[in-house]
A protein has these predicted regions:
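Active-site helical microenvironments for divalent-metal-assisted chemistry
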Residues: 1-250
Length: 250
């Protein structure tokens, strides 16, 4: 129900050439050089068959996630760090290489992203008996994510990456894992986006999370909204017609 027209389609595998062509028109000079350096490192060290938990090619995932990061206007080094967000998994001396190829600021951002990735991987929300306890645990996780980073852009990048994951999930079949990721998104990441005032990502995360968790209810609501939209447009057109006729009489 929330528009995704400003980003790539869920099923599209973004190539480095497409990515560079897109951002070459937006950045130049030192900023573009940083992004090109990050891309070269990712192309060198990400295995060709590397994929995310949901099956998206890793390089395409991080490149696609930068489109969401770019919407937040948090500078070129954040885009470069997003591209390199999986580098710690595949390269032991990634810190040295990142600092040499890019700069220390990007290295620190990638370090923060790596810490957040590990936290969310090993501290997922447990199945608890009462909704109150579940809510308390989710709130603790959100506070921890904010408290542990020295640069809030790390959390914003993580939100953008989760948004890309949710976006990509529209192209794959329903599964328990898909519903689990959707629930985690609704429990942790959508409220976190709300707390940080990142409204566009909040709406996307809530919309897609509900869609994957409750596809039948989502379809019913979407249909009702479409019907109401038709009624609203008909009403607006009628009002415009009345106004135009009255103006013609003047």
């Amino acid at each position: 129900m929330v528009s995704l027209t400003r980003v790539i389609s869920p099923e599209q595998t973004l190539t480095p050439e497409q990515w560079l062509a897109h951002f070459s028109g937006k950045f130049s000079g030192e900023d573009l050089a940083l992004m090109q350096g990050a891309l070269e490192l990712a192309q060198t060290y990400y295995p060709k068959d590397a994929k995310t938990q949901m099956g998206e090619p890793m390089l395409s995932h991080v490149l696609s996630a930068t489109y969401f990061v770019d919407e937040l206007h948090i500078f070129a080094d954040a885009l470069a760090a997003t591209v390199l967000s999986a580098l710690p998994v595949y390269c032991q001396n990634w810190q040295e290489l990142t600092t040499q190829k890019c700069n220390a600021s990007i290295t620190r951002l990638v370090e923060g992203i790596d810490q957040v990735q590990k936290l969310t991987k090993f501290a997922s929300i447990e199945k608890i008996n009462t909704p109150e306890e579940h809510q308390q645990q989710a709130e603790s996780m959100r506070k921890m994510l904010i408290a542990m980073v020295s640069d809030i852009r790390v959390v914003l990048i993580k939100l953008a990456m989760r948004t890309r994951t949710m976006h990509f999930m529209a192209s794959i079949p329903d599964s328990d894992l898909k519903r689990e990721i959707a629930k985690e998104t609704l429990d942790i990441f959508a409220p976190l986006a709300n707390r940080l005032g990142v409204w566009q990502l909040k709406w996307l995360l809530e919309d897609l999370g509900f869609r994957y968790q409750n596809p039948e209810a989502y379809s019913r609501i979407a249909k009702l909204l479409d019907e109401k939209r038709t009624e609203r447009m008909e009403y607006i057109n009628n009002v415009v017609g009345v106004i135009e006729r009255e103006l013609d009489r003047l």
